[in-house]
């Protein structure tokens, strides 16, 4: 016994068997083809002999035809048996492959069952619930912070938009006048201007002050 000889695997055995069966099948098919050609020749000869009226020769040829057709039938049966053996061998190999696969799957399931024992599963579920709760709290805190920031930004944006809208309505000139207007009550007494200047601008100043007071009052209502 050669200890260094490579062990034959089921796949190698199947390949060898299929090759041998294919060779045998081709040999039988060649023989069947040859006999079928001989059958055609013999049939033609029987017809020719029958036309001459030679009854004895015709019967001898007919017996040869019967034996020939029987040989063809036997060879066809052998070919069918070889094909059946090939199919059976392939089925056995498939069963072997399935068995090997089932063994591997069984080992995998055993390993998973060991890793996922009830106590380990309970611990995994508990850890998952804990981490999930922490994640929910973190997300909630982040959402509150984001909402608060957005609310402040929206309030500031709304205030700024409203202010700009009011300033657009009253005009940039009025805004400039408001920024340069005297602080406190507008009617407060100040140092007396020169007599000539007071006499000239008295009417115009009075009308401007009245207009500013009206617009300031409207801004306060807004």
From Swiss-Prot:
Organism: Arabidopsis thaliana
Protein name, as recorded: Vacuolar protein sorting-associated protein 2 homolog 2
Family membership noted in the UniProt record: Belongs to the SNF7 family.
Function: Component of the ESCRT-III complex, which is required for multivesicular bodies (MVBs) formation and sorting of endosomal cargo proteins into MVBs. The ESCRT-III complex is probably involved in the concentration of MVB cargo.
Region (Disordered): 179-222
Disulfide pattern: none
Cellular compartment(s): Endosome
Record keywords: Coiled coil, Endosome, Protein transport, Transport
Ranges in coiled-coil conformation: 26-83, 143-222
Entry GO terms, CC: ESCRT III complex
Gene: VPS2.2
InterPro entries xrefs: Snf7_fam
Assembly notes: Component of the endosomal sorting required for transport complex III (ESCRT-III), composed at least of VPS2, VPS20, VPS24 and VPS32. Interacts with CHMP1A, CHMP1B and VPS60-1.
Keyword match rRNA processing: no
Organism domain of life: Eukaryota
Any Gene Ontology biological process: vacuolar transport
Extent of Low complexity compositional bias: 187-203
């Amino acid at each position: 016994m050669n200890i260094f000889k490579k062990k034959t695997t089921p796949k190698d055995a199947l390949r060898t068997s299929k090759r041998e069966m294919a060779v045998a099948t081709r040999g039988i098919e060649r023989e069947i083809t040859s006999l079928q050609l001989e059958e055609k020749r013999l049939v033609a000869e029987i017809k020719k002999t029958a036309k001459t009226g030679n009854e004895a020769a015709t019967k001898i040829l007919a017996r040869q035809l019967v034996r020939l057709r029987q040989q063809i039938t036997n060879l066809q049966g052998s070919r069918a048996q070889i094909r059946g053996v090939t199919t059976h061998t392939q089925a056995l190999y498939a069963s072997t492959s399935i068995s090997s696969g089932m063994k591997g799957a069984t080992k995998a399931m055993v390993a998973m069952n060991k890793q996922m024992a009830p106590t380990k599963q309970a611990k995994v579920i508990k850890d998952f619930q804990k981490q999930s709760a922490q994640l929910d709290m973190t997300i909630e805190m982040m959402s509150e912070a984001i909402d608060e920031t957005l609310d402040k930004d929206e309030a500031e944006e709304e205030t700024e938009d409203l202010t700009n809208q009011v300033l657009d309505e009253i005009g940039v000139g009025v805004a400039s006048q408001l920024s340069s207007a005297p602080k406190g009550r507008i009617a407060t007494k100040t140092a007396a201007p020169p007599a000539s200047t007071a006499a000239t601008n008295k009417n115009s100043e009075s009308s401007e002050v009245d207009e500013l007071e009206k617009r300031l009052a409207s801004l306060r209502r807004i």
